[in-house]
């Protein structure tokens, strides 16, 4: 196959920011390698084989990539219409999860989808829907952003309801989503006094979640344990051991020792396995990949000609990379345990699909701006060509 044919196929099928594509492919490869290394104990406990879990995870990774590809082919402006309904659907789903959800990490965070018998986290759908709809609402109210009734009240209601319901079972996810909402509102030129009101709504929602939710006591205990190093939790202790023993170049692929001790080495502590097996070099590479993803997402936001595209790309990029930073910070001892997975790397089902959708939408924004810039450049070239023809005829 000739290089020109390959380039033509890539240009046709992998549109948008090519750097983002490269970063996602690199993180997906790292995910397959590290998860395969860390699922031995899980397979043994469930009387299964590591190969079966490897195939399942690899399928999930490709499913996420497929979701990303489909999402990047769709004009990002359509998402505000489709996911407006998803925002309304998220409310009863979150309430149902709180009352009848499956236990995951000692909390009711998932529900089982009928027919396909797969666990699903409604908070993933709710987070994506809120970010998209918040970006849409603010982009439409740019001319009257100071209007309390038109611009502020809808934002306060939706942020308070969605973040509050998520906080009932997953406080850390609610806090990250709330921070993302604050960023979108700040970029969307929301007045500072209104941002202060949003903070007040967030504090009230958080207080209600601590009182009535299932994770209030756990969250306070984890914060206390983080402050008092003499009460270091089991996971945090062995996560730091993995980091400390990894050294500069690591123990090599498949040679982790803490993978057999950590309760979830393939999930929220997968970064510990990355450092233990690939050393400080591997840890830095993963960190840099996420920073590149953030930079390219923010660049797409900056280059966007439409307010909706800019707010959308900025919000999704920040939410995804902030989650990654929290996960890595917990592993190296910079924060209390949160249970947050490492996006695009941790083993997961529908979470991988929703992450793929988020990245695909970012790519859709970058693709749209590239096409507009290309169209403007082509139009300018045509004008210049016509002017030259006229000059030639006049001469």
Regions found by a protein language model. Name each.
Residues 138, 180-194, 258-282, 341-355:
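Interfacial segments of multi-pass membrane proteins
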Residues 104, 108-110, 196-286, 305-312:
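Hydrophobic, glycine- and aromatic-enriched re-entrant/interface helices and adjoining loop segments
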Residues 2-27, 33-168, 328-343, 347, ...:
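Membrane-helix boundary/helix-loop-helix interface segments in multi-pass membrane proteins
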């Amino acid at each position: 196959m000739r290089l020109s044919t390959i380039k033509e196929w890539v240009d046709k099928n992998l549109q948008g920011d090519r750097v983002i594509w490269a970063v996602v492919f690199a993180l997906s490869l790292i995910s397959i390698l590290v998860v395969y290394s860390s699922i031995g104990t899980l397979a043994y406990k469930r009387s299964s084989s590591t190969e079966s879990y490897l195939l399942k995870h690899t399928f999930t990774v490709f499913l996420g990539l497929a979701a990303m590809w489909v999402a990047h082919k769709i004009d990002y402006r359509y998402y505000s219409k489709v996911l407006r309904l998803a925002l309304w659907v998220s409310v009863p789903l979150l309430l149902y999860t709180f009352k009848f959800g499956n236990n995951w990490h000692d909390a009711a965070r998932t529900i089982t989808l009928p027919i396909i018998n797969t666990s699903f986290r409604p908070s993933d759908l709710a987070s994506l829907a809120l970010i998209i709809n918040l970006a849409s609402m603010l982009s439409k109210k740019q001319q009257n952003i100071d209007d309390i009734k038109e611009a502020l009240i809808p934002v306060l209601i939706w942020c308070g309801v969605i973040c509050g319901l998520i906080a009932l079972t997953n406080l850390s996810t609610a806090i990250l989503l709330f921070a993302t909402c604050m960023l979108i509102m700040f970029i969307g030129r929301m007045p500072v006094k209104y941002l202060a009101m949003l903070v007040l709504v967030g504090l009230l929602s958080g207080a209600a979640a601590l009182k009535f939710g299932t994770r209030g006591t756990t969250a306070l205990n984890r914060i206390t344990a983080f402050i008092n190093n003499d009460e270091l939790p089991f996971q945090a202790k062995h996560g730091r051991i993995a980091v400390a023993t990894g050294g500069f170049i690591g123990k090599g692929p498949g040679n982790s020792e803490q993978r057999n001790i950590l309760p979830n080495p393939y999930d929220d502590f997968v970064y510990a396995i990355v450092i233990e097996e690939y050393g400080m070099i591997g840890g830095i590479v993963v960190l840099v990949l996420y920073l590149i993803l953030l930079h390219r997402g923010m660049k797409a936001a900056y280059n966007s000609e439409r307010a909706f595209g800019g707010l959308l790309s900025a919000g999704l990029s920040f939410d995804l990379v902030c989650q990654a930073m929290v996960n890595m910070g917990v592993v190296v001892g910079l924060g209390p345990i949160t249970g947050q997975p490492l996006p695009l790397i941790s083993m997961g089902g529908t979470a991988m699909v929703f992450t793929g959708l988020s990245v695909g939408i970012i790519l859709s924004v970058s693709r749209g701006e590239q096409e507009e810039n290309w169209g403007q450049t082509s139009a300018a070239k045509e004008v210049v060509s016509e002017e030259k023809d006229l000059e030639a005829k006049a001469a």
